[in-house]
A protein has these predicted regions:
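Short, small-residue-biased leader/transition segments that mark boundaries at the very start
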Residues: 6-22
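Structural motif
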Residues: 19, 39-42, 53, 62, ...
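Active-site loops and adjacent core secondary-structure elements that bind or stabilize anionic groups
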Residues: 21-63
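Phosphate-interacting basic helix/loop segments used at nucleotide- and nucleic-acid interfaces
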Residues: 23-24, 73-81
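Short helix/loop capping segments that flank catalytic or ligand/cofactor-binding pockets
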Residues: 50-53, 79, 101-104, 135-136, ...
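Generic long, charged, amphipathic alpha-helical segments
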Residues: 79-81, 88, 103-111, 115-143, ...
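Glycine-rich phosphate/diphosphate-binding loops and the adjacent beta-loop-alpha structural elements
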Residues: 91-104
Length: 214
């Protein structure tokens, strides 16, 4: 950007083009980034064909493989953590919390905070079709698409399935074959059958498309 020097703005960074600014400690060039990797990464795989988002800031982990612990709501997952039912190495799956399933794609902060409180933040992973915020700590994957409410693979995962997250390979996979389970899946009853949230659930697009309504 550029501001005209006669517009009342003194000679500062704001009055010059970015190419003329030599002290680049804040806005770095591609050749000299602040860190070698960004704060988030997009993964794809058999568990997230349309993609998902993993937060990398705040930890150095890039790989995790473990048995799935499946929960159909944030509340059920939170209770399991509080009751001591989650073990080191587990991959916690929280589903039906996406844009359509929630509805609204609420934040899974309570579960991640509980995991940190139980001392499990560095030894488990969490995968959800819900979302996270900047306050989240640990190896967390959100925005899984397609979401469970739309019949995405995350809806077919069962307790004990082996789930593998590999940030370097940009993959999120489940080892088991989901095909035979497809015919057994039935969409759950909607949480709202009337009102604004019911309408929203019917209209909202996938998280991979911005969760917009048409």
């Amino acid at each position: 950007f550029f501001f005209h020097p006669h517009a009342g703005i003194p000679d500062s960074v704001a009055s010059r083009g970015l190419g003329d600014v030599y002290k680049r400690q804040v806005i770095r060039s591609l050749e000299k980034p602040i860190k070698s990797r960004g704060g988030i990464a997009i993964l794809h795989g058999s568990l997230a064909p349309d993609g998902c988002v993993v937060k990398l800031a705040g930890h150095e982990r890039t790989h995790h493989s473990g048995p799935a612990r499946v929960f159909d709501s944030e509340e059920l997952a939170f209770a399991a953590v509080q009751n001591g039912d989650i073990e080191s190495g587990d991959v916690i799956i929280i589903r039906y919390e996406g844009p359509k399933g929630g509805p609204g794609m609420r934040e899974m902060l309570a579960v991640t905070a509980a995991l940190m409180g139980q001392g499990l933040g560095d030894s488990v992973a969490l995968v959800t079709d819900g979302r996270f915020s900047g306050a989240t700590h640990g190896f967390m994957v959100g925005h899984v698409a397609p979401e469970a409410a739309k019949g995405g693979p995350i809806a077919l995962v069962r307790d004990g399935d082996t789930v593998t997250l590999d940030v370097d390979a940009r993959t999120l996979d489940v080892e088991e074959d989901m095909g035979p389970r497809r015919s057994e899946w039935r969409p759950p009853e909607p949480r709202y059958v009337k009102g604004a949230l019911a309408k929203y659930a019917k209209l909202v697009a996938s998280a991979s498309e911005g969760a917009v309504t048409n």
